[in-house]
């Protein structure tokens, strides 16, 4: 989807980048659908390398959130690296932004556009589900709704990037953003 041909966004634009997976992108699935990668260029880093300016407010928020989630989700503090959340790049649950009106409004005032990243991961031993997988989670729906509301009020576009392994229900929310991009599992450079 690319309403009013808003894509590509103008290089040098200041972007508010929402979504935990924007800063910890998913390069591949699990089991044989995983890729052995020397490094991963996350969506946030890829946008910077392409000449966009990422809002430091959103970046700081999600970097702290992702670190906290890794601590909560790791099986035990002294587990081997290959068992850690950071090694497997799990999709952490999105934070509930329903009470983050001031944060989102500040970003809408300060930035030229918003990019919201949604992610899914699947593969051997981790089949997908209908609830909170094919369908968005309540937190993801809230994030899209709040970001679209704030940025559209300022006359600014919103792009949703889907870093996913398969189909995701879009009919219930696709009218909200100005553009939807399917990134799929891009390999090591998102």
Feature locations, PLM:
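C-terminal non-catalytic regions of proteins with extracellular/luminal or membrane-system context
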Residues: 1-190
């Amino acid at each position: 989807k690319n309403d009013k041909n808003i894509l590509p966004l103008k290089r040098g634009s200041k972007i508010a980048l929402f979504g935990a997976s924007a800063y910890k992108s998913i390069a591949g699935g699990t089991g044989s659908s995983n890729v052995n990668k020397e490094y991963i260029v996350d969506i946030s880093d890829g946008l910077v390398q392409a000449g966009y300016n990422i809002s430091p407010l959103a970046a700081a928020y999600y970097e702290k959130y992702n670190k906290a989630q890794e601590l909560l989700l790791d099986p035990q503090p002294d587990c081997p690296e290959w068992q850690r959340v950071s090694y497997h790049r799990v999709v952490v649950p999105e934070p509930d932004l329903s009470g983050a009106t001031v944060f989102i409004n500040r970003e809408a005032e300060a930035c030229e556009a918003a990019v919201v990243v949604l992610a899914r991961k699947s593969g051997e031993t981790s089949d997908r589900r209908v609830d909170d997988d094919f369908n968005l989670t309540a937190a993801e729906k809230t994030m899209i709704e709040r970001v679209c509301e704030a940025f559209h009020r300022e006359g600014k576009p919103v792009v949703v990037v889907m870093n996913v392994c398969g189909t995701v229900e879009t009919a219930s929310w696709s009218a909200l953003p100005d553009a939807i991009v399917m990134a799929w599992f891009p390999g090591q450079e998102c």
